[in-house]
Amino acid sequence: MAASRSPHIRLLHIRDEINGVTDAIKGVSFEDYRESYALRRVSERALQIISEAARALPVELTGKYPAAPWNAIIGIGNILRHEYQHLDDRRLWEIVTVHLPQLRGVVLQMLSDIGDA
């Protein structure tokens, strides 16, 4: 198995994207986010990467961590790629500010369980 396809590497990608987008929006209001093309695109790209990395994780692994909404995580990538015209800034803001920090906790636990936090 190539290193870039390993679950460990995919989890690191998810963790790093969550950290990056969280840092990018730290201290930003929803109104400022909505008005900032750059912040919206940073958030969308991070979600695409997170979604793709989650899609590549084995079901045997994700099944052990039902606290994360894996199907929704994978599904947001499809929306970002194929139904981008229907994006809702408020919903993306909620995902980035509420749900990604929760996912980060699950991902850190997964990394710890497989031997790398």
Question: What is each model feature region?
Answer:
Residues 1-117:
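Solvent-exposed interaction patches of small proteins and small membrane subunits
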